Amino acid sequence: MSGFFQRLFGKDNKPAIARGPLGLHLNSGFTLDTLAFRLLEDELLIALPGEEFTVAAVSHIDLGGGSQIFRYYTSGDEFLQINTTGGEDIDDIDDIKLFVYEESYGISKESHWREAINAKAMGAITLNWQEKRWQRFFNSEEPGNIEPVYMLEKVENQNHAKWEVHNFSMGYQRQVTEDTYEYLLLNGEESFNDLGEPEWLFSRALGVDIPLTSLHIIG
C-alpha cells in the first residue's frame, strides 16, 4: 500500500544526487570549448583528448579556512578540478583547471616512496621537465626545497565505493603566452587496501586553466 501512495504522490526512496559546484555529480557529463587550446597546441605539452567527458568518480579535499577542492575524474585519464572558497556557488569558485595524466607508476618499497616525495625530489623552486623550465607555484614565496603539500582526498566512484587517498603534492607552472599558463602537478598517493597495507603511486599530470564560459554541464 505504501508503494501505491509513493507512486501516486510522486515520491520514491531514491537518495538525492549529491551535486557539487556547477551541479557536477557522479555520472554527469561536461563539454569543453577547446578552440583556444587547439590554437596553441604547438606551444602546449598537454594533449586535450576530446571535448566531451563523463564523470566516473568524484572527490573532495577540505583545505581548511573555507577553502575546498572538488575533483571530477573522467572515464579517461583526465580530471576537472574546481577550487572554491566560502561555499559551492558559482560566485565561490576561485579556479577551474583540467588535468591530464602524463605518467604514473606504482612504488613497492617504503624507502623508494620516501625518496619520491621528499623535498629534494619534488619541492625545488624550479624544475626542468620535458625540455621545459617550470616554476613552483605552491608556496612560491618559500626559498629552497620544500616538503610537498599534504591533502586528504575523499573519493567515490560510480559503484559508490568510497576510499581515502593521502596526497603529497607539488604544483609547477610555465608561461606559454602572455595570458596562458601550463601546469605540472606532481603527486604521491598513499592509500590502504582491505588488509590495511599501504599502496603507493606517483604521477605527473599536465593542466590548463578552464574559463567558466567554455564549460558546459550535462545532466
Predicted segment positions?
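Mixed-charge, low-complexity intrinsically disordered regions
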Residues: M1-E51, V58-G219
